[in-house]
């Protein structure tokens, strides 16, 4: 039976790797495929362990969602991924680092695609807002930050303009 589309309140996250395109040019396709597969496996395991869902892989980008009652677990997973993926890439000799962005909002969740080949996806402004967040480490929108519990909030600081929250360890980016 087809999965119905529904409005869902979600923590929407997008992760990708800095310098991935440049690094992929210096290796052969076999190493590239092995590296991206190891990255996918690592991200997938961490997201599933935290109760989240991989919506899709897009090259080195990954669209991830967590249900509204899993915001802290989702953000903790992103923080853990930042450290573990950076370590994985360093061990492989790749000069890539993980960037993670998260926003809390509503999106339409359900099956999308061509007839006979529909896949679960999330569509809406919350997804666009997530991807548009500016940051170099782990960045949260105000809406995502406000959903965090008090202990996890202490791991972030305000970064303006526009207002977003970044890990204490991440440098500020000035334009």
Per-region residue spans from a language model:
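Short helix/loop segment flanking the catalytic signature motif in cyclic-nucleotide metabolism enzymes
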Residues: 28-31, 56-97, 102, 122
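Catalytic/regulatory signature loops of cyclic-dinucleotide turnover enzymes
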Residues: 89, 125-146
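Catalytic NTP-binding/metal-coordinating core of nucleotidyl cyclase/transferase enzymes
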Residues: 2-73
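Alpha-helix/helix-capping structural signal
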Residues: 18, 106-107, 128, 143
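Intrinsically disordered, glycine/charged-rich C-terminal tails and inter-domain linkers
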Residues: 1, 9, 136-175
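Catalytic-core segments of nucleotide cyclases and related cyclic-nucleotide turnover enzymes
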Residues: 109-134
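A general secondary-structure junction signal
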Residues: 58, 100-106, 142-146
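A short glycine-enriched loop-to-beta-strand structural element that forms part of the catalytic core
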Residues: 11, 94-111
């Amino acid at each position: 039976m087809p999965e119905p589309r529904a409005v869902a309140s979600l923590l929407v996250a997008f992760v990708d790797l800095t310098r991935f395109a440049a690094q992929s040019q210096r290796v052969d396709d076999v190493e590239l495929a092995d590296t991206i597969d190891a990255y996918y496996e690592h991200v997938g395991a961490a997201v599933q362990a935290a109760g989240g869902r991989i919506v899709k892989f897009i090259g080195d980008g990954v669209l991830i969602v967590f249900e509204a009652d899993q915001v802290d677990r989702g953000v903790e997973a992103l923080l853990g991924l930042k450290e573990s993926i950076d370590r994985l890439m360093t061990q492989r000799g790749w000069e890539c680092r993980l960037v993670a962005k998260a926003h809390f909002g509503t999106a339409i969740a359900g099956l999308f695609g061509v007839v006979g080949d529909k896949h679960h996806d999330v569509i809406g402004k919350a997804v666009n807002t997530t991807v548009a967040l500016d940051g170099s480490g782990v960045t949260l929108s105000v809406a995502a930050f406000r959903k965090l519990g008090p202990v996890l909030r202490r791991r972030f600081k305000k970064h303006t303009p526009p207002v977003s929250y970044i890990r204490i360890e991440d440098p500020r980016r000035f334009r």
